[in-house]
């Protein structure tokens, strides 16, 4: 068990799975804040999950606290981050998983409540962005209080792009993520004034959408800044997404050599973050997979030694939540 104590703000899809990931990794979660979920409902929501299954341990409530196995977790329902008594609860770090307080200015409100650092579980417009296995060594504990764990798609794409760029060089690349639907979409057609297609029924359609994930790679791998862009298709599956990366390489490499480079990384410096498979897999095979990026060796194609299409799967919920937990541990270690 780590001596790191963590609070979670927002007990939605990512907040609940970050709690699961922290429990698996021995991180002590001491407090949860969500103004829209009372304690009794919190017990129910954590215990039962339609995608990842019932929590295998014991979940209950006692004396106004959430009890998970033998862990007692304080519960708050504050609307404003600065009102949450993180310090009183003993939370050193806070995972900001509401999707609302993304900027340094807004996320810094948690510091007023007694937290020492904040990890935003989404892309931030101005906070330093980290992808485990790619650029976590750039974390500076002396100057970085608010950081971002980037997006689930960037966490899948960046490690793969790093392996390819380090071994063959990327001249330019296009990415498409075929992405599971999320809570921001509509179950049936509804209003979406800014992006009309986003308002169409999520389980009825393949929906072209925008994503900043490819451009964000340039923030974590500066040498690739301006060399990648991409788009998304939202598709009717509840979990697991897949990145398709089409690259023009600087140095020629056969598809066999590319597979070898990714496999070497998956078994070496990126073990746990990048996976490698040659099985004939489909999306549901990766529900609950904790890798950031699972390279599908059998699905990619090579047009020639300088032009390739690479495929990598990711559990956009569970894999990402494990990276949040890993970043917490890494930051604590660096302190």
UniProtKB/Swiss-Prot annotation:
Subcellular location: Cytoplasm, Cytosol; Cytoplasm, Cytoskeleton; Nucleus
Gene Ontology MF terms: glyceraldehyde-3-phosphate dehydrogenase (NAD+) (phosphorylating) activity; microtubule binding; NAD binding; NADP binding; peptidyl-cysteine S-nitrosylase activity
CDD domains listed in its UniProt record: GAPDH_I_C, GAPDH_I_N
Keywords of this entry: Apoptosis, Cytoplasm, Cytoskeleton, Glycolysis, NAD, Nucleus, Oxidoreductase, S-nitrosylation, Transferase
A GO cellular component entry from the record: cytosol
GO BP of this protein: glucose metabolic process; glycolytic process; microtubule cytoskeleton organization; neuron apoptotic process; peptidyl-cysteine S-trans-nitrosylation; positive regulation of canonical NF-kappaB signal transduction; positive regulation of type I interferon production; protein stabilization
Active-site residues, record numbering mapped to chain: 152
InterPro entries tied to this protein: GlycerAld/Erythrose_P_DH, GlycerAld_3-P_DH_AS, GlycerAld_3-P_DH_cat, GlycerAld_3-P_DH_NAD(P)-bd, Glyceraldehyde-3-P_DH_1, NAD(P)-bd_dom_sf
Residues marked Activates thiol group during catalysis (site): 179
PTM (free text): S-nitrosylation of Cys-152 leads to translocation to the nucleus.
Main location class: cytoplasm
SMART domains: Gp_dh_N
Gene3D superfamilies: Dihydrodipicolinate Reductase, domain 2, NAD(P)-binding Rossmann-like Domain
Catalytic activity as recorded in UniProt: D-glyceraldehyde 3-phosphate + phosphate + NAD(+) = (2R)-3-phospho-glyceroyl phosphate + NADH + H(+); S-nitroso-L-cysteinyl-[GAPDH] + L-cysteinyl-[protein] = L-cysteinyl-[GAPDH] + S-nitroso-L-cysteinyl-[protein]
Purpose of the protein: Has both glyceraldehyde-3-phosphate dehydrogenase and nitrosylase activities, thereby playing a role in glycolysis and nuclear functions, respectively. Glyceraldehyde-3-phosphate dehydrogenase is a key enzyme in glycolysis that catalyzes the first step of the pathway by converting D-glyceraldehyde 3-phosphate (G3P) into 3-phospho-D-glyceroyl phosphate. Participates in nuclear events including transcription, RNA transport, DNA replication and apoptosis.
Subunit text: Homotetramer.
Family named by the database record: Belongs to the glyceraldehyde-3-phosphate dehydrogenase family.
Listed name of the protein: Glyceraldehyde-3-phosphate dehydrogenase
Species whose genome carries this gene: Oncorhynchus mykiss
């Amino acid at each position: 068990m780590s001596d790191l104590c963590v609070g979670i703000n927002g007990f939605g899809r990512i907040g609940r799975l970050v709690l699961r990931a922290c429990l698996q990794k021995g991180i002590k979660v001491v407090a949860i804040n969500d103004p829209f979920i009372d304690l009794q409902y919190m017990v129910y929501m954590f215990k039962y999950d339609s995608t990842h299954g019932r929590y295998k341990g014991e979940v209950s409530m006692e004396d106004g606290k959430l009890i998970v196995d033998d862990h007692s977790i304080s519960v708050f329902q504050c609307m404003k981050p600065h009102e949450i008594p993180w310090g009183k609860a003993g939370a050193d770090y806070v995972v900001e998983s509401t999707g609302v307080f993304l900027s340094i200015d807004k996320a810094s409100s948690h510091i007023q409540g007694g937290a020492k650092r904040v990890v935003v579980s989404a892309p931030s417009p101005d906070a330093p962005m980290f992808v485990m296995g790619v650029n976590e060594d750039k974390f500076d504990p002396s100057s970085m209080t608010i950081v971002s764990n980037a997006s689930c798609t960037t966490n899948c794409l960046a490690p793969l792009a790093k392996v390819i760029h380090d071994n063959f060089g990327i001249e330019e690349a296009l990415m498409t993520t075929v992405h599971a639907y999320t809570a921001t979409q509509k179950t049936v057609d509804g209003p979406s004034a800014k992006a009309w297609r986003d308002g169409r029924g999520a389980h009825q359609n393949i929906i072209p959408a925008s994503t900043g994930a490819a451009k964000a790679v340039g923030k974590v791998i500066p040498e690739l800044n301006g060399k990648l862009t991409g788009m998304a298709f939202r598709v009717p599956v509840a979990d697991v997404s897949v990145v398709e990366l089409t690259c023009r390489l600087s140095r020629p490499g056969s598809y066999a050599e590319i597979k070898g480079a990714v496999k070497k990384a998956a078994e070496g410096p990126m073990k746990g973050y990048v996976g490698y498979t040659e099985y004939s897999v489909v999306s549901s095979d990766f529900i609950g997979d904790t890798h950031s990026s699972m390279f599908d060796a059998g699905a990619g194609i090579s047009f020639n030694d300088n032009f390739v299409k690479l495929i990598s799967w990711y559990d956009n919920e569970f894999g990402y939540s494990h990276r949040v937990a890993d970043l917490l541990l890494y930051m604590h270690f660096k302190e």
